Amino acid sequence: MLIRPFLLTFASMKRQESSEYIHFLIAQGEHQQQDFKFEISDARKIAKTLSAFANTDGGRLLIGVKDNGKIAGVACEEEQYMIQAAAEQYCKPGVTYSMQTYFVNGKNVLLVEIAPNDKKPVYAQDDN
């Protein structure tokens, strides 16, 4: 019987830590290695951001966060698909990244971390 309350407390602690981490990142604002995106609507457009991070020291995207730092939330499945398509299909060579979804203030925020690429330059393909 003691296990269940412990697990519930542990789960709520992890949620709080995750939420605090996202708030910490948002408080830093946008900078050379961090960008906020309200949503991802086009894999080709986001490929430019991914390639820019991959060509420098890497960086992170907080998707579901407005430019002013307000959390808007996202439907993560579509954004995850767009990031995957951008990194694998529209960046040459491909970009190494990781994604994690955080539940913050009742909304989903997708954190995408892009590693610096060993093979540079990374090009973002466009229609031309």
Sequence positions of predicted segments:
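Conserved N-terminal catalytic/coupling substructures associated with nucleotide/phosphate chemistry
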Residues: 2-128
